[in-house]
Amino acid sequence: MTKELWINLPVENISRSKEFFESIGFELPNSPGNTDSSAVIKVGTKGITIMLFQEEIFKGITRNGLTDTNTGTEVMFSFDLGSREEVNELAKKVKDAGGNVFAQPADVQGWMYGFAFSDLDGHRWNGLYMDKS
C-alpha cells in the first residue's frame, strides 16, 4: 500500500532552487537527500515531499528527456493558503525571490482568491485561499 507521494522535479541549479524555495517559506528539512545534486522540500502541514534533482540526474532517473517549460507546461501544483493576506504576501515573496508571477492575486470563481507563478526552472504553481463559507 502506498504511504507517501513524492514529487520529483528537474532543476538547472540546486543551490539557486534551494534558496528560492526557502525564501518563499517552503521547508528544507535536514535530510540525506540534500546533496550537491538533489534537495528535499516539504510543503504544507501534511509535509508533501518534493525532490529536486539536477537536470542530468533527473534525466538518468527517468530515462527520458525534459519538458521545455518555456514553451509547454508539464504540470501545475496547487496548494491552499490561510487567507487573502497570505496569498498577497506569498506573491510578493515569489517576485522578490526571482519567480515569475504570471497571474496576479485575484478573485477566482467567486469563492477563491489566488495567484499563479513559475519558479526559477519554469515549474508552475498556484496558491489559493478558498472561502468555503
Language-model-derived ranges and their functions:
Residues 53-58, 130-132:
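Acetyl-CoA-dependent GNAT
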Residues 1, 67-72:
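Short, flexible turn/loop "capping" segments at secondary-structure junctions
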